[in-house]
Amino acid sequence: MISASSSKYDMIMKASVSLFTERGFDATTIPMIAERAHVGTGTIYRYFDSKETLVNVLFQESIQRFTEKLKQDVSELPVREGFHHVFCCLVQFTKESDYALFFLETKKDAHYLNHTSKKMIENLTQMLDDYFNKGKAEGVIRSLPSNVLIAIVLGAFLKIYQLVQTGDIEMDTDLITELEQCCWDAIKLHSSQK
């Protein structure tokens, strides 16, 4: 059985990530979070001393969950297999939390992130950078900067996922497979480019 305090914490976190994603950090207030989470404002302050603390805990938990999904160093896998692994992790992560991936992407350079949050995203970005550098060195991935390659893949994935959230398309196995292949085709070095 889930304790009431654990349940309240979870409700606060879910309400926070959705509001921060929808409205942004500055336009979201603690009373709005409390209303959406169906808890009192004071309850939020029992867990977090400020909105900045709340957003950093949320950010760090999201980064940690995604990093745990990756589990292994993708730079040690064959390049195409590493891409498949990262892509599957993106799919799993968004299925578990509709807003978490959007939150991580839109807030990664935010002024209110503390040192720990910035360090965690830096570590994740470095892991992906190592993977892309390996692929570029092996002549498998285009020689674009890693942040551009990440933007190509993540941008396409996030836009498709927005269409899923609005009900415009259904995310099924065939779509996931085709989307992965499209993203891979966008970043791989084609034989005519060598």
From Swiss-Prot:
Residues 29-48 bind DNA. Residues 6-66 form the HTH tetR-type domain. It comes from the Bacteria. The keyword Transcription regulation applies. InterPro entries: BscR_C, DNA-bd_HTH_TetR-type_CS, Homeodomain-like_sf, HTH-type_Tx_Regulator, HTH_TetR. GO terms for biological process: regulation of DNA-templated transcription. Pfam families: TetR_C_10, TetR_N. SUPFAM superfamilies: Homeodomain-like. This is HTH-type transcriptional repressor FatR.
